[in-house]
C-alpha cells in the first residue's frame, strides 16, 4: 500500500465484493432509489505482527486509531449517491501476511438517469459507481469486482422485477485536476448495473384503462342525433383528457420526449378532434341538403378499430422492446 511502502511505485490492487441486501424506495419522479448492502474490499500491504499470528479484527471506532498509527485504508466512495450514505458497522481484518479486508454496511439514496420512453413498460438500471476518493489509478486500481444479488434476484420490489447484475471496471479522467496533478487525473471506477423491469399493472388499471374509457365515451357522439349534443359531448370529453394529462404529468419528471402514456393521450386528442371535425362536416352537408348517414355509420366502426389498433401497437411495442 502507498503508506506502507512509499518506494513501491506500482498501484495497489484492490478487489471489491458488493452484496445487495435490498433495493427499495424507487422514486420515479426524482430518479432515485435506495440501496442497502455490504461492501468488502481487500488489498495486500506489508506483513505485520498479529497476536498469535492470527487474523486481527478491528471494528468501528477502533479503525480510526489504526489509521492514525499509519495503517493504510483508502477511502472508497459511491459517487452517484445523493447526500451522505449511512455507513453502519465497519470492520478490518488484518492478516500476518499483509492482507487487509475491509467490510462495511452501507445505506444510501442513489441517482441515475432513467429512460422513460416506454413508460409504464420501461426497463431501468439501478447503478452504483464506486471510486477511491484520493488515490488515482497510478496509486490504486480496482482489480476485481463481484456482486451478489441473491436476496433480490427475480423478486418484485415496489413495482419492479429485478433481473440480473453486470459489472465494469474503467478509468475515468477528471480534467479539472490536470493543473493540480498533471498526468495523475485518472481514477479507477467500478460500475455496477442492476437490471430491473417495471410491473405495469398499477398503471394499466389506474391510468390506461380510465383513459381508454374516456376515449371510448367520445365515440358515443356518432349515435347522438342532435348536433349541439354531439359538440357538447366532444368538447367536454376533450377537456377531460386535458385534465387527465395534467394528472399523469405528476408521476414523471419533465421530459424532452414522449412516453407510451403520452402517445396514448395524444392519440386520444386526435380521436376526439377528428370526431369533432367529422360531425361538423356531416352537419354542414346536412345543412346543404345532402343527407349522408353512411359517413356517421362508418365512423361508429372506424374510430374504435383505429384507436384499438394504435393502442395495441403502443402496448406491444412497450412490452416487447
From Swiss-Prot:
A Pfam cross-reference name: Neur_chan_LBD
Gene Ontology CC: plasma membrane
Chief subcellular location: membrane
Subunit structure: Homopentamer.
Family: Belongs to the ligand-gated ion channel (TC 1.A.9) family.
Bilayer-spanning residue ranges: 204-224, 233-253, 264-284, 301-321
Stretches assigned to the Periplasmic side: 1-203, 254-263
Span(s) of short sequence motif Cys-loop: 115-123
Keyword Translocase annotated: no
Cellular localisation: Cell inner membrane
Keywords from the named record: Cell inner membrane, Cell membrane, Ion channel, Ion transport, Ligand-gated ion channel, Membrane, Receptor, Transmembrane, Transmembrane helix, Transport
Membrane topology: Multi-pass membrane protein
Protein name as it appears in the record: Cys-loop ligand-gated ion channel
Primary role: Mediates cation-selective currents but does not discriminate between different monovalent cations.
Cited InterPro entries: Neur_chan_lig-bd, Neur_chan_lig-bd_sf, Neur_channel, Neuro-gated_channel_TM_sf, Neuro_actylchol_rec
Annotated GO MF terms: extracellular ligand-gated monoatomic ion channel activity; identical protein binding; transmembrane signaling receptor activity
Side of membrane Cytoplasmic, spans: 225-232, 285-300
Amino acid at each position: 500500500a502507498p503508506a506502507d511502502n512509499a518506494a513501491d511505485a506500482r498501484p495497489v490492487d484492490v478487489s471489491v465484493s458488493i452484496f445487495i441486501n435490498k433495493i427499495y424506495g424507487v422514486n420515479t419522479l426524482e430518479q432515485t432509489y435506495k440501496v442497502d448492502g455490504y461492501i468488502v474490499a481487500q488489498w495486500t500491504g506489508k506483513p505485520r505482527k498479529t497476536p498469535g499470528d492470527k487474523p486481527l479484527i478491528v471494528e468501528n471506532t477502533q479503525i480510526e486509531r489504526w489509521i492514525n498509527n499509519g495503517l493504510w485504508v483508502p477511502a472508497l466512495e459511491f459517487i452517484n449517491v445523493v447526500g451522505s450514505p449511512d455507513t453502519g458497522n465497519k470492520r478490518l481484518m488484518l492478516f500476518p501476511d499483509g492482507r487487509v479486508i475491509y467490510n462495511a454496511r452501507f445505506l444510501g439514496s442513489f441517482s441515475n438517469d432513467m429512460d422513460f420512453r416506454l413508460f409504464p413498460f420501461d426497463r431501468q438500471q439501478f447503478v452504483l459507481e464506486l471510486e477511491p476518493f484520493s488515490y488515482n489509478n497510478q496509486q490504486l486500481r480496482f482489480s476485481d469486482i463481484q456482486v451478489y444479488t441473491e436476496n433480490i434476484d427475480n423478486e418484485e420490489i415496489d413495482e419492479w422485477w429485478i433481473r440480473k447484475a453486470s459489472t465494469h471496471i474503467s478509468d475515468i479522467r477528471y480534467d479539472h485536476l490536470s493543473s493540480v496533478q498533471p498526468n495523475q487525473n485518472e481514477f479507477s471506477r467500478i460500475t455496477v448495473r442492476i437490471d430491473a423491469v417495471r410491473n405495469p399493472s398499477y398503471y394499466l388499471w389506474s391510468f390506461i384503462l380510465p383513459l381508454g374509457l374516456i376515449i371510448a365515451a367520445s365515440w358515443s357522439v356518432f349515435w347522438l342525433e342532435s348536433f349541439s349534443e354531439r359538440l357538447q359531448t366532444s368538447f367536454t370529453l376533450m377537456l377531460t383528457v386535458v385534465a387527465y394529462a395534467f394528472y399523469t404529468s405528476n408521476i414523471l419528471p419533465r421530459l424532452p420526449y414522449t412516453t407510451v402514456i403520452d402517445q396514448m393521450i395524444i392519440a386520444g386528442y386526435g380521436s376526439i378532434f377528428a370526431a369533432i371535425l367529422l360531425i361538423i362536416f356531416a352537419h354542414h352537408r346536412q345543412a346543404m341538403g345532402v343527407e349522408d348517414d353512411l359517413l356517421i355509420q362508418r365512423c361508429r366502426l372506424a374510430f374504435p378499430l383505429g384507436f384499438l389498433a394504435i393502442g395495441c401497437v403502443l402496448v406491444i411495442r412497450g412490452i416487447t422492446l
